[in-house]
Amino acid sequence: VLTGLDNRLKNAPPEDWARITILVNTQRMARRLRELFDLGPPRFLPKIQMLTDLDNFLPDGPSPPSMSGLKRRLELVSLITKLIESQPDIAAQSSCFDLADSLANLIDEMQGEAVTPEDIARLDITDQSGHWARTQQFISIAQKYISAAKSAPDPTARQRENVLKLQAHWIKNPPPHPILLVGSTGSRGTTQLLMQNIATLPQGAVILPGFDFSMPRQVWNQMMGTFTGEDHPQ
């Protein structure tokens, strides 16, 4: 990343470095980039921030703070406890916290991929009807939680809301300065959406990790199918 910026900015005014924003997906990468910049030569530094920290891009200011993980866990425990009390055969009372953690992970995945409880309820699982009926009862808890948490969304839901706001804003008002998203593979739906948005900006770029620049075009073309490319390292 640093080498590429050096090559592109070698004849640019020094203040152009300060106009660049670099979004990274881990604190470790942010620290490493800062360490490399600290090695010199002296220059203005770009802004380096986490891709989950998008508040400074939002046109209307920061979104409301997200719900804490502990509060979410306790709310899910409360909902699961009520379900178990009404149907004691569904699970042991001692499993409430484990079930809450599993349900929290499911909710994160649903919100990150924009999957609603209604989408899951419509799945046709005819060969596992008994197990599926129990699963749907827990899905109903997720539905209650998501509906009740709209005023104070958890971090995953808040991030998706921010990305959707930026998508709408950037269509009409693209940022006047370069934005680079570095090091993410887009394995999460919300991050992938952010990457797509940045890649379409006039001064946006997405830098993928481990990209094979020597791979022939025909191999890339073979990976276009949903199933033919899913196991390929690229």
Language model: regions and residue ranges:
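Conserved P-loop NTPase "ATPase switch" module shared by AAA+ and STAND
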Residues: 175-187
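Glycine-rich P-loop/Walker A and Walker A-like loops and their local beta1-loop-alpha1 context
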Residues: 1-33
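Residue-level signal for alpha-helix termini/capping positions
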Residues: 10-14, 171, 199
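Basic/charged alpha-beta structural segments of nucleotide/phosphate-handling enzymes
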Residues: 24-174, 189, 196, 202, ...
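Short, glycine/acidic-rich beta->alpha junctions
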Residues: 14, 186-190
